């Protein structure tokens, strides 16, 4: 029987949850059964993990998923956990679990993690003994670094005396191996146009809120000076793609012969006002700055980013921020913990036409950080224009308005709603109308790109 491993898709959620329910039946009769049968993966939680690219699925020739592995990055720091790994009992003992585990550990290594952790039953052959065969060793579960795992076990009601924690150290990747980097999306919590400069650019005020969801950039260093984008991005020729332009812009600051292969996994809707292309470019700048040994300072990198687009500097600096000018004057902000329902209405909104719209308000009085913090400043200058010209965006705003105060991000087309809890965000997303696509994301003060950069900086690639 042949199978292959791929990133899980949202339309596979029900199949993966069914695999988990089938796999847990194998524990009937075990002392842990009473707690195991009470714990199952909610579909909305699985969907969120898939959206973050942390679930891989084993698929047989017919297209049927027969197993999956799910990594959990909530542990933080230089470790990532195996939240769940299951194989359909009818497809057990065929190497599927081993292949899924190796695939997940390989990705974690490329992402700069130092180890992979998990909790499992000590006496079940396909649990602790299986993981031991694949490089995991038992650890002292009372160590401070496993506090998160201990709390998760308590929440699930798992019996402490039957469970063992295990860890697998990951060797640093070779300098010419693929590395994996996040490119987070953003939303604009408000957007005001306060004037127009002599050069024709508009003076803006906005708040960029970074999200924990976005694209993935994969980089492999070359030493022949060549820069290649290996993945096809519909409608975006390689030579005009911001990721290629970013690499070329940084190249003169790197040692002679520095080159790179680039792969882009798009999750953020293109042209949605979520900063996907700008974030991709920033990730290439920040990652290659270290991988190539250019070691430019953040200010210099941000200036290079500004040459690519007004939104690139905020992603280079990696902090949610109050922005002015054309978006390049940034003041970092610490914002309340919030979750966002981001709705993609699947409609193209041409930004240039909006800036030329006669009805666009271009001379609003300047806002202040305090007026934003008090909730007085929430409008988006583009929203009235987009509502009038783009019926699907208007319908998306109207639908989200039924749950709170819906807002447009950037110049659209995506809209969003801020919520106080992930549970409320997921409940709203579950009701998404046909024809729209909903995403749930958490706001982050510090970019996942900078978290990844810290992990990579903690790795001595010469093994010292």
State what each model feature region is.
Residues 1-11, 164, 170-178:
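Conserved N-terminal entry element of GNAT/NAT acetyltransferase domains
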Residues 174-272, 290, 294-299, 326, ...:
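ATP-binding N-lobe of GHMP and related small-molecule kinases
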Residues 114, 121-128, 134-174:
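C-terminal "cap" of GNAT-fold acetyltransferases
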Residues 263-292, 405-419:
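Glycine/serine-rich anion-binding loops at beta->alpha junctions
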Residues 99-115, 287-291:
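Conserved acyl-CoA
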Residues 10-13, 17-90, 101-103, 107, ...:
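Acetyl-CoA-dependent GNAT
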Residues 316-405, 418-464:
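Conserved, helical-rich catalytic subdomain that frames metal- and/or nucleotide-binding sites
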Residues 64, 88-102, 111, 122-128, ...:
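Conserved glycine-rich acetyl-CoA-binding loop
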């Amino acid at each position: 029987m042949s199978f292959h491993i791929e990133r899980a898709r949202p339309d596979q959620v029900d199949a993966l949850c069914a695999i988990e329910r089938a796999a847990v039946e194998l524990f009937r009769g075990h002392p842990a059964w009473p707690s195991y049968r009470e714990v199952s993966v909610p579909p909305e939680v699985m969907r969120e993990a898939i959206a973050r690219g942390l679930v891989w699925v084993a698929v047989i020739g017919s297209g049927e998923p027969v197993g999956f592995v799910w990594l959990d990055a909530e542990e933080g720091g230089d470790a990532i956990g195996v939240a769940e790994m299951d194989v359909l009992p009818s497809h057990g003992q065929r190497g599927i679990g081993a292949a899924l585990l190796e695939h997940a550990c390989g990705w974690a290594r490329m992402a700069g993690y130092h180890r992979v952790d998990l909790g499992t039953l000590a006496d079940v052959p396909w649990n602790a003994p299986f993981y031991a065969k694949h490089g995991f060793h038992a650890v002292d579960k009372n160590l401070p670094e496993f506090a998160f795992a201990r709390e998760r076990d308590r929440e699930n009601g798992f019996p402490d005396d039957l469970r063992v924690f295990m860890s697998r150290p990951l060797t640093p990747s070779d300098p010419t191996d693929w590395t994996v980097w996040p490119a987070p999306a953003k939303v604009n919590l408000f957007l005001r146009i306060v004037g127009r400069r002599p050069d024709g650019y508009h003076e803006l005020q906005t708040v960029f809120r970074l999200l924990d969801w976005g694209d993935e950039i994969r980089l492999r260093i070359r030493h022949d000076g060549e820069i290649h984008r290996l993945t096809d991005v519909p409608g975006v020729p390689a030579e005009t793609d911001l990721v290629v332009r970013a690499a070329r812009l940084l190249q003169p600051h790197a040692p002679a012969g520095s080159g790179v292969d680039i792969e882009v996994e798009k999750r953020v809707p293109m042209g949605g006002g979520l900063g996907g292309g700008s974030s991709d470019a920033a990730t290439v700048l920040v990652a290659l700055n270290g991988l190539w040994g250019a070691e430019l300072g953040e200010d210099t990198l941000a200036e290079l980013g500004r040459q690519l687009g007004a939104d690139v500097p905020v992603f280079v600096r990696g902090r949610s921020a109050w922005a002015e000018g054309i978006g390049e004057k940034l003041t970092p902000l610490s914002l309340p913990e919030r979750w966002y329902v981001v709705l993609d209405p699947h409609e193209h909104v041409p930004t240039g036409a909006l800036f030329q719209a006669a009805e666009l308000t271009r001379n609003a009085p300047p806002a202040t950080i305090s007026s934003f913090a008090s909730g007085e400043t929430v409008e988006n200058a583009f929203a009235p224009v987009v509502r009038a010209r783009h019926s699907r965006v208007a319908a998306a705003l109207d639908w989200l308005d039924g749950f709170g105060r819906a807002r447009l991000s950037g110049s659209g087309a995506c809209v969003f709603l801020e919520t106080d809890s992930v549970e409320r965000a997921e409940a709203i997303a579950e009701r998404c109308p046909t024809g729209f696509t909903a995403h749930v994301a958490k706001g982050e003060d510090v970019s996942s790109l900078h978290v990844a950069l810290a992990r990579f900086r903690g790795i001595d690639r010469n093994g010292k």
